[in-house]
């Protein structure tokens, strides 16, 4: 068995584990007090994380460069980031429902990379000259981690919008504080919804969304700055309005607006969630859309023909 076959096995195994884990979290939604299901779900995420990390490590060993030089590698790294953030949230914040957000998106990203990308795009290729730099590790890893955090935070906001759909609900209070504190007060005209435990879940989702985006935004900022420094080193210009640079700036502006409305204006609930939903679309355009067009300085190394 050669390294390519091992990589294929690891990719398929990680996808299968994520699929099984998603089913486990679905069962957990029915049997809410079953701790065994929760344990199996966490183990599924943990082993999936390990398998993807092993896959990327093998590619690193085989290619002699950090495995973030094409679309397949970046997608698998994004999948790893989703599972990594899941484990962090479960460990330090102890929010079990996060699996309903992280597992499906990690599985879909894994599936797209493993089953939909052409085989020639999955194989590791030599680095183009501009990518032969130590900036590759810092810039690309930070950008991918920021994408993962922003996507997860935006998905939580979308979940909040679904949960509060057709409900007259308003959140009041300060966004800053401990996520486990009862620091927000909720005003709702819908009495049945007020009696439902969903209001507490909505409260938690809104707060967690804010904090996750609060992690992704500084990472995105650092990623853009490091990319500008790398661009100056490689091409002699800090900023050239390349499509990827332009959409990264748009992404930064959208989430800056989100954080500004929450921190300065005191917005909570539906209005910032709508901004985050817009940000969710923009992130995917920045990450996948620009590369699918195959134009600009960032198109090489992702889609080769």
UniProtKB/Swiss-Prot annotation:
Membrane topology of the entry: Multi-pass membrane protein
Main subcellular location of this protein, as a coarse class: plastid
Keywords in alphabetical order: Chloroplast, Cytochrome c-type biogenesis, Membrane, Plastid, Thylakoid, Transmembrane, Transmembrane helix
GO BP annotations listed: cytochrome complex assembly
Listed transmembrane segments: 11-31, 36-56, 75-95, 97-117, 142-162, 212-232, 239-259, 273-293
Pfam family, one: Cytochrom_C_asm
Listed InterPro entries: Cyt_c_assembly (IPR002541), Cyt_c_biogenesis_CcsA (IPR017562), Cyt_c_biogenesis_CcsA/CcmC (IPR045062)
UniProt GO MF annotations: heme binding
Cell compartment(s), UniProt: Plastid, Chloroplast thylakoid membrane
GO cellular component terms, A-Z: chloroplast thylakoid membrane; plasma membrane
Function: Required during biogenesis of c-type cytochromes (cytochrome c6 and cytochrome f) at the step of heme attachment.
Oligomer and partners: May interact with Ccs1.
Family affiliation: Belongs to the CcmF/CycK/Ccl1/NrfE/CcsA family.
PANTHER family: CYTOCHROME B_B6 PROTEIN-RELATED, HEME EXPORTER PROTEIN C
The name this protein goes by in its record: Cytochrome c biogenesis protein CcsA
Originating organism: Mesostigma viride
High-level lineage: Eukaryota, Viridiplantae, Streptophyta, Mesostigmatophyceae, Mesostigmatales
